[in-house]
């Protein structure tokens, strides 16, 4: 699981979901990538699940890069708790993703297998995505 080693503050405000991605919109490391088309909070479990789906499909011979990191805590209060009495305890670690951001990148010799691996990973993510190549622009 991806989580920060240590943080300055345990609890943070919720990040803004509006606007487009300012950086990280190009495929830079690999040949193919997954690009978000809508804003979302992606948890560390969803990132890990997508990574496992890709690695199991390509087996060997390729390389995967994860371009997002879940560095924001999301808090939640327990069920059947009255309002007030402070903010809830941190429940998840999330990455705030905006439209246009490249989430994963991959290099693999066979394009069909690479696209299928990325398609399987896209099903694990909570937002609409598309597969992009190094030549395409957003």
From Swiss-Prot:
Disordered, as annotated region: 1-25
GO molecular function: rRNA binding; structural constituent of ribosome; tRNA binding
Record keywords: Ribonucleoprotein, Ribosomal protein, RNA-binding, rRNA-binding, tRNA-binding
Family indicated by similarity: Belongs to the universal ribosomal protein uL16 family.
Function: Binds 23S rRNA and is also seen to make contacts with the A and possibly P site tRNAs.
Quaternary structure and partners: Part of the 50S ribosomal subunit.
Protein name per the record: Large ribosomal subunit protein uL16
């Amino acid at each position: 699981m991806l989580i920060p080693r240590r943080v300055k503050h345990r609890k943070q405000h919720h990040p803004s979901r509006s606007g487009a991605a300012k950086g990280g919109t190009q495929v830079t490391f690999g040949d193919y990538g997954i690009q978000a088309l809508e804003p979302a909070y992606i948890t560390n479990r969803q990132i890990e699940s997508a990574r496992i789906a890709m690695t199991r499909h390509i087996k060997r011979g390729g390389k995967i890069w994860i371009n997002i990191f879940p560095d924001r805590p999301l808090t939640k209060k327990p069920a059947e708790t009255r309002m007030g009495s402070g903010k809830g305890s941190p429940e998840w670690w999330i990455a705030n993703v905006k439209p246009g951001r490249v989430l994963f990148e991959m290099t693999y010799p066979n394009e069909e297998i690479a696209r299928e691996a990325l398609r399987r990973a896209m099903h694990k993510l909570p937002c609409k995505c598309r597969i992009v190549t190094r030549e395409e622009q957003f």
